[in-house]
Amino acid sequence: MTELKRTPLYEQHRRAGAKLIDFGGWEMPVQYAGVIEEHKAVRSKAGLFDVSHMGEVELKGKDSLAFLQYLLTNDVSRIQDNQIQYSPMCTSAGGVVDDLLVYRYSREHFLLVVNAANTDKDFAWMQAQAEGFEISLENRSGDFAQLALQGPWAEKILQKLTSMDLAQINYYWFKHGEVDGVLCLISRTGYTGEDGFEIYLPPEHAPRMWERILEVGGSEGVQPIGLGARDTLRFEARLPLYGNELGPDITPLEAGLGFFVKLEKDNFIGKEALSAQKEKGVPRKLVGLEMIERGIARSHYPLQKEGKEIGFITSGSFSPTLNKNIALGLIPPEYAQIGETLDVIIRGKAVKARIIPSLFYKRQG
């Protein structure tokens, strides 16, 4: 059995009584107080996440921008220094290798943040596409710890530890500066549907930073949050999860991410396949579902219409915010009308669900 990797915060999680699980080869906290309580804390106050398992790849060289324009579906030329962009990274068939964040330091220097379980695969994929480009790629994942402070009180809490004016960091922008005396990269990003920040710092400083944020945020009710609530939070906000809404056999267009696929851009990997799919119309569409009958629709459960299998669930859970069982499913567009009823097959039994708008939660303001 392969030994599980641990983040620099493993001892903090263990001491806090977190329930630890294997997540993509990492021993990570799935919950502390409980998923529902943690979920509600992030929606109403603030939560602190250990996301140090995420991968970071540094890209340098005079062809850096040209390489990213070829590698990714989004138009990286649109972002400025200190700005961040989300993009799928596709195969030539249009399937998704991964979805990632691009941090631009300069035209010749970027940081790419990828999903934990995909880090090695992504790095190998990038290297394989790099031929002919004057660039260097380095897997820097071991050099960064990453904390995410999310929720309506996130800015107020983090501001106590830095002289930087956090209100000046706009959504999907970042700055370098000191937090509690440690030089960090701070970005206004997150995976919860709430306002918040992601803090990149040297691993040796992560345990103290974790403890300090929980300490100074105590009066605002900040709580440590596990991966269980991270999943229900992202799911309510319709943020895709690789392996569920995205994968080698699901295109960004099918997943409803057409906004991040710039087909007018010059040649990029997957352009031909995605252009053809757009012209022809997507064969499948991601829809929101609410359970009419009792049951939770889990990932990969079949979806049927009048006894005929038409698709499958990508993600499903109880929604603490809406107080009902909801899901996302991938089905042919002809079945995708709002209000249409479908059957989810749960342990061999057909359980009724209704199609609803898939953005289950959007924060106010």
Swiss-Prot record:
GO biological process annotations for this chain's record? glycine decarboxylation via glycine cleavage system
GO cellular component assignments: cytosol; glycine cleavage complex
Asked if GTP-binding is a keyword of the record, the answer is: no
Could you tell me what this protein does? Answer: The glycine cleavage system catalyzes the degradation of glycine.
Which family does the similarity line name? Answer: Belongs to the GcvT family.
Catalytic activity, reaction form = N(6)-[(R)-S(8)-aminomethyldihydrolipoyl]-L-lysyl-[protein] + (6S)-5,6,7,8-tetrahydrofolate = N(6)-[(R)-dihydrolipoyl]-L-lysyl-[protein] + (6R)-5,10-methylene-5,6,7,8-tetrahydrofolate + NH4(+)
Q: How does it assemble?
A: The glycine cleavage system is composed of four proteins: P, T, L and H.
Q: Which cysteines are joined by disulfide bonds?
A: none
The record lists the organism as Desulfitobacterium hafniense (strain Y51)
Output this protein's name: Aminomethyltransferase
Query: Which controlled-vocabulary keywords does the entry list?
Result: Aminotransferase, Transferase
Which Pfam family is an annotated match for this chain, by its short name? GCV_T
Q: What molecular function does GO assign, one term?
A: aminomethyltransferase activity
User: What is the enzyme's main class?
Assistant: transferase
Q: Which InterPro entries match?
A: GCS_T, GCS_T_bac, GCST_C, GCV_T_N, GcvT/YgfZ/DmdA, GcvT/YgfZ_C, TrmE/GcvT_dom1
Q: What is its EC number?
A: 2.1.2.10
Q: In the UniProt record, does the keyword Transferase occur?
A: yes
> Quick one: which gene encodes this?
gcvT
